[in-house]
Each structure stands twice: as C-alpha cells, then as structure tokens.
Regions:
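Active-site environment of divalent metal-dependent phosphoester hydrolases
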Residues: 36, 56, 108-112, 133-136, ...
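Binuclear metal-ion centers of metallo-dependent hydrolases, dominated by the metallo-beta-lactamase
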Residues: 133, 137-163, 291-393
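Bacterial N-terminal signal peptides
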Residues: 6-15
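Pre-active-site segment of Zn-dependent metallo-hydrolases
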Residues: 45-103, 108, 113, 117, ...
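Zn-dependent metallo-beta-lactamase
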Residues: 16-84, 170-178, 184-212, 391-393
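Active-site neighborhood of phospho(di)ester-bond hydrolases with catalytic His/Asp-centered motifs
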Residues: 49-52, 98-108, 127-130, 232-238, ...
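Active-site-proximal loop/helix segments of hydrolase catalytic cores
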Residues: 202-293
Length: 393
C-alpha cells in the first residue's frame, strides 16, 4: 500500500480525504520572481517557491580540481543573506506580509539561500529536503517549522499534502541538472546534520552547506474548482535528461526514477494532463516529460542566470529554438516571461499573462524589459553553441 505520510503532528494534514472546497471562480496567480523563484496565490493561500533574492557573488566560488565542470563546489568565505531585499519583495507581493508555505525544489544556494529568511520574516512552514531543513535550522528556524519530504512514489513514500483552500500538493522526487562530469552538482547529496554555527551555515558551495538535497523535488498542484473542472500544474526547478529514467540515489538509498515518480503522482491525482508546466531544460528533456504530463502550457524558469542583479530587471530575452519547435509541434503553448514579476493567471479557461503593474512599480521594474536588436542576436548566437542547462545558461 502506497504511503501518504502522516504530517499532522507537523501542522500539515495529508489529504486522505477530499480537500476543503475553494471559493467559486477560483484561479491561481503565479508570479515569477527571477530564476526559479515563484509566488503562488490561490484564494487565501500564499506560497513562495525557492525565493532566492540574495545574489551570492560568483567571485567567491572555487571549482573542484578533480571535476572542473563543477564550478560552484567550494567558496572562499561565507556570505550573509540580504534580509532587506527579501523583506522588500515580501512587502511588495503581500500587503500584510503573510505567507503560509515556502517550498524548496532543491537545496543549492540559488534556491534555498533565503528560505530561512522567508520563514523567519513570515512564520511560513518550510517544505523540502532534509538538507533544506538543516540549512534553515543553522540560520535559526526551529526544526518544528520545517517538513522533510521524500517524493518517492515508487517506494511508497510519495507525499500527498492538503494545503487547505482546496489545494492538494503532491511531492515528486526528481533529479538535478548535469551529468557525471559535474557529480557534486548532479548526483544526490544530503547534509548529515545542520551546518556548523560558526559560519551560520552560509558556505554556498554545493560540496559545502548547500548540496542539492538528494536530487530535487517537483511539485504537482491540484486545485478544486466548484462548478468547473479541477485546475492543475506541475513545477520543477531542475532536471536532467542524462538519467531521468534511472533511480535517484542518495546515501545508498534509491528513491525511484523521476519519470516513474511523476507518472505515479499523476495517477494518484487522477490526471492525464496538466494545465501548465513550469519547467527548466531542453527540448530533449521536454520530449521525455511531455508524454507523462501532457501540459497545455509551458512556462520556462531558471533560464536567466543566477549572478545577475535582480534589480536591473531581466538581463536578456528567452530564446530556445529547439524547445519552441518541439512544443509547437505538440500543440503546447509556450508563454515566456518579459520581465521579473510577470504574473500568470490560471483559471478554467487557461493561462494568461497579466501585467502586475502595481507590484512591478513598487520594486522599480518596467512592465516589459526592452532589449536592443544586438542583444537578441547575441542570445541566438550563444544559444546555437551551448545546450540549455539550468546551472550553465
């Protein structure tokens, strides 16, 4: 019998019974906050995913001598989170500063560096890997405020969590981008204990305080919609076609392959397709995942680099000819971003891109980023020589 882990003691009710009903005319608002950072608002439910607003500078990273493709293995010094910037974003997206959950896709610095800050500023519950919870503890978040999830449906440890407001979350164990040439980044790695307090757990290297957390976690959302069909979307912040069909392993334990876990979560949700897929990766990766989830809309994320200052706005336009061609051939609508804090609205009709002008104005962003023809040309030239990867844009 497949396990739906009981998380009642940690303040989460696993949805063995039907979820509470959402208000009529329900819709999902999904705001892109750069990289793989999202703010989801579903009725009264408010969720941040990843929420990496601090920018740890590239200059402090040292690559592995043995694996030079592992460019972010070590650092020369700890780096403090930018609490003021996180607070600024919080105040712009939420009028009362309230947040219910912080989801962590995986535990690398460009995803979880600010998770503890979000939790401390808002009281939100963290959901993620054991590494994410240890990272948060090192920064002062009580262990009781963080829920460790597996997402291993094929071993009977796939979580189905009732978030309230008619929203059910299914956790899906996934892999991380890369391959055997950058094993520290790619293969599953977990912290064994909270990072040492002497540096606050703030050594950003993937072989230091921020390993990937045993691969990554994708999140499959379903939203009750009284009087209409159920809404659904799947979001993943990293993936690799290299071993998508092979089991994710960490510390000698197997968690099943990403594709098998995703297929099992889809069956558990009673879904044959999703309204939207928030994703990262190439046409090759999409060709493996699309047959499992059959998305109506593809929304890219983690394509804009992670060392650029967020406050300058989108650094370059989205461009992936091969992915665009694949999606078009399969009738999947591609809706790329035009600026940070673009807002997508999902409802019974589909997905629409909303201006979100009030939030952008609070943060100093234009409605849509303007790019010179030379920038477009440079992006296309670069695209022709380098395959897309969420850690090597």
């Amino acid at each position: 019998m497949r396990r739906a882990a009981s998380l009642v003691a940690l303040g989460l009710l696993v949805a063995a019974a039907p979820s509470r009903t959402a208000a009529p005319g329900v819709h999902v608002e999904m705001t892109w906050m750069s990289i793989a950072n999202w703010y989801f608002q579903i009725g009264g439910l408010r969720i941040v995913m990843d929420g990496y607003i601090t920018r740890v500078p590239e200059k402090i990273f040292v690559p592995s001598r043995q694996y030079p493709n592992d460019r972010y293995t070590f650092t020369t010094q700890p780096w403090k989170p930018n609490v003021a910037d996180v607070r600024r974003v919080r105040d712009a997206i939420s009028s009362d500063g309230r947040l219910d959950f912080v989801l962590a896709g995986h535990s690398h610095f460009d995803h979880t560096y600010d998770v503890a800050t979000w939790a401390l500023l808002t009281g939100a519950r963290i959901i993620g890997s054991q590494s994410t919870c240890y990272q948060a503890q090192a920064q002062g978040v009580p262990a009781s405020q963080c829920t460790v999830v597996s997402g291993s449906w094929v071993t009977g440890h796939g979580e189905r969590i009732d978030l309230g407001h008619g929203v059910t979350l299914r956790v899906v164990r996934f892999n991380h981008s890369g391959d055997a040439s950058n094993p520290y980044q790619h293969f599953g790695r977990e912290l064994k204990m909270p990072p040492h307090a002497v540096n606050g757990g703030l050594r950003a290297g993937v072989a230091e305080d921020f390993p990937n957390g045993g691969g990554s976690r994708g999140y499959l959302f379903t939203v009750d919609n009284p009087g209409g069909r159920k809404l659904s979307f799947f979001v993943n912040d990293s993936a690799s076609a290299f071993d998508l069909t092979k089991p994710v392993t960490a510390d000698g334990l197997s968690y099943g392959s990403p594709l098998a876990n995703l297929a099992a979560a889809m069956r558990d949700a009673g879904l044959t397709s999703v309204d939207a897929w928030i994703a990262t990766g190439s046409a090759g990766l999409a060709s493996m995942i699309v047959p499992v989830i059959h998305p109506k809309v593809y929304i890219p994320n983690h394509w804009d680099g992670f060392f650029n200052s967020m406050w300058r706005g989108l650094p370059f336009p989205f461009s992936d000819k091969n992915l665009s061609s694949y999606l078009s051939a399969h009738g999947i609508r591609l809706v790329p971003q035009t600026q940070y804090f673009d807002l997508y609205q999902l409802d019974a009709v589909g997905v629409s891109l909303q201006p979100n002008l009030a939030v952008k104005q609070k943060l100093g962003f234009t409605h849509a980023q303007a790019f010179a023809p030379a920038t477009h040309a440079a992006v296309k030239a670069f695209e022709a020589t380098v395959p897309p990867d969420d850690c090597q844009e």
